[in-house]
């Protein structure tokens, strides 16, 4: 079976075609600027040159129509007909409390996804547009939803509840949900394989460090805690998100800067984090370069970043009662040598010792701990699309 993996954003559609006989990727692509003048489709078929098509597309249905045309194109397609696609897997950011695993999409599933529009307004609506576009164009195959929140649904109330009046949980389901679950799931399972232990017997801390960043503590095959919360704003310092702050700062700055709630939401999600602290960029590569040139704000931003990650490592080791491995993944985690080194510095007392020479790699699956480190330190490139393809295949076959 061949599976089409779709990740629909507000103005983009990312896709892959995966042949499940050997899990090979037959094509990857991106439709960018959907509904905006200047739409482009970049399509990279296996063993062929990348193709770029420029064509304005009014909506996600038009975008998916173009994707399907490209997939069967005689010159640069990867399949002969759409009959070869046995199922479609959709990334959905928020499944609320309703889903602890991936599911075949039906009317009830779509109702729950729509219920979560209010708590995931930037992600769930375009995810749903992608689902409905694909269902219109491919009505005879199974469509599967794979939720970013699902992996974290094993958390207990001690870690998912906030100390707010209990009725806000009962009425509005205000609680910690966590995100990046598909990535945490993939690298945690790979880490167990690298440890040579059953996954259900491991204590693992996963660090998904990208422009958005989150960590998870996994024990006996279950997430017990994760750093993102009710929304992806909570937790680590990120590219443009503040992460953990005193909630009173929100009200103070709304008053001082004359912001309404929407403007405040934008302020803490889009103007804060490493961008706000450094004044340089949201990109850690730029901030590292600026710090190396003597920029004091960039240095402070990096110190705040390292401090926050270290704090979560200590927190999670306490909750796990020890740890077998740390796992670095995502754009920063896989590629930023200096970031990894500084995060792991001075953690010897916890049994975490990095080999700085082994650490000088990017994008490879490797153990960078010293031989005598009690805790292994793994770099594992994430593969969310493969998880989506596998779940889709298993539910559709």
Curated annotation (Swiss-Prot):
Mg(2+). Can also accept Mn(2+). The record marks 180, 241 as: Transition state stabilizer. Keywords: ATP-binding, Cytoplasm, Kinase, Magnesium, Metal-binding, Nucleotide-binding, Transferase. Mg(2+) binds at residues 7, 384. It comes from the Bacteria. InterPro entries: Ac/propionate_kinase, Aliphatic_acid_kin_short-chain, Aliphatic_acid_kinase_CS, ATPase_NBD. Transmembrane segments: none annotated. Pfam families: Acetate_kinase. This is Acetate kinase. It comes from Syntrophomonas wolfei subsp. wolfei (strain DSM 2245B / Goettingen). The gene is ackA.
């Amino acid at each position: 079976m061949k599976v089409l993996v779709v990740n629909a954003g507000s103005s983009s559609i990312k896709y892959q075609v995966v042949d499940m006989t050997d899990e090979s990727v037959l094509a990857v692509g991106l439709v960018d600027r959907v509904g905006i003048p200047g739409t482009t489709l970049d399509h990279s078929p296996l063993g062929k040159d990348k193709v770029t098509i420029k064509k304005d597309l009014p909506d996600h249905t038009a975008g998916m129509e173009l994707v399907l045309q490209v997939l069967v194109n005689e010159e640069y397609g990867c399949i002969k007909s759409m009959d070869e696609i046995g199922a479609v897997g959709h990334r959905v950011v928020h499944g609320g409390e309703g889903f602890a695993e991936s599911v075949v999409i039906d009317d009830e599933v779509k109702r729950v996804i729509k219920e979560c529009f209010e708590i995931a307004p930037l992600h769930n609506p375009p995810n749903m547009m992608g689902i409905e576009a694909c269902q219109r164009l491919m009505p005879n195959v199974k469509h599967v939803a794979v939720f970013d929140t699902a992996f974290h649904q094993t958390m207990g109330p001690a870690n998912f509840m906030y100390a707010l009046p209990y009725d806000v949980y009962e009425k509005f389901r205000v609680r910690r949900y966590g995100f990046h679950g598909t990535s945490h799931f993939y690298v945690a399972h790979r880490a167990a394989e690298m440890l040579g232990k059953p996954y259900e017997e491991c204590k693992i801390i996963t660090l998904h460090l990208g422009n958005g960043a989150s960590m998870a503590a996994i024990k006996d095959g279950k997430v017990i805690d994760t750093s993102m919360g009710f929304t992806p704003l909570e937790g680590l310092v990120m590219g443009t998100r503040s992460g953990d702050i005193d909630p009173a700062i929100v009200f103070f700055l709304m008053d001082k800067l004359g912001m309404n709630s929407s403007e405040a939401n934008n302020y803490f999600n889009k103007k804060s984090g490493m961008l706000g602290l450094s004044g340089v960029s949201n990109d850690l590569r730029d901030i590292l370069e600026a710090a190396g040139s003597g920029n004091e704000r960039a240095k402070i931003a990096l110190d705040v970043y390292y401090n926050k990650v270290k704090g979560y490592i200590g927190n999670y080791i306490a909750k796990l009662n020890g740890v077998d491995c740390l796992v670095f993944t995502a754009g920063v985690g896989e590629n930023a040598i200096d970031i990894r080194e500084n995060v792991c510095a001075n953690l010897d007392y916890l049994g975490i010792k990095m080999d700085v020479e082994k650490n000088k790699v990017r994008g490879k699956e490797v153990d960078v701990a010293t031989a005598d480190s009690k805790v292994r330190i793994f770099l594992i490139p994430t593969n969310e699309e493969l998880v989506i393809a596998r779940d889709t295949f298993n539910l559709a076959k």
